[in-house]
Amino acid sequence: MYPVSDAFLRAVRSNTRKYFWTGTIVTRGGMTYEFGAKEIVKGSGYISRQCCGSTEIELGTVYAAEMGITLLSDIDRYTLEDAQVTLVFHLVLADGSVEDVPMGVFEVSEANRLAKCLELKAYDFMLRFDKSFNGFETVGTAYDFIALCCKRCKVEFANKRAEID
């Protein structure tokens, strides 16, 4: 969970609220593209989370997020292979200030051009764990095993040893 203020929680619970989204796309080549509410096609954005790929419970699955968004943009779709999209939700509070909540970093899996629009589909880093791994290669604590998995899958590990051991 991301910590938010009491004012944020009150604003979310109110009958009406003002909010907007912004984001950044960083290509493999290092090009950075910023986008905001003006570039996002209204009603096109979503973030959905799912644990299993089917209707049955499967062992070894992860809780992954999919992000989709359509942008009014002339970015060349071919430059977006494996690009990273960072999304931020901005909520306007009762006093007029804005509180930001980072919504995650996603890797682009599909980029399609529709006239003047760029349609993106991306997944969070949890899908990086979808690979074969021999867990018997290591000996150690739970922390050591998780840290090794994160390193091999190139996923940042945010926990401290004391939180896990």
Predicted region positions:
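Juxtamembrane "anchor/assembly" segments of surface/extracellular structural proteins
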Residues: 1-80, 116, 121-129, 135
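Intrinsically disordered, low-complexity coil segments
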Residues: 43, 93-99
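Short coil-to-beta transition motif at edge beta-strands of beta-rich domains
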Residues: 78-95
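Short alpha-helical segments and helix-capping/turn motifs at coil-helix boundaries
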Residues: 54, 72, 90-92, 104-107
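Short, mixed charged/polar active-site loops
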Residues: 32, 98-103
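Charged- and aromatic-enriched interaction segments used to assemble
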Residues: 97, 112-165
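Short beta-strand-centered aromatic/proline hotspots
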Residues: 101-113
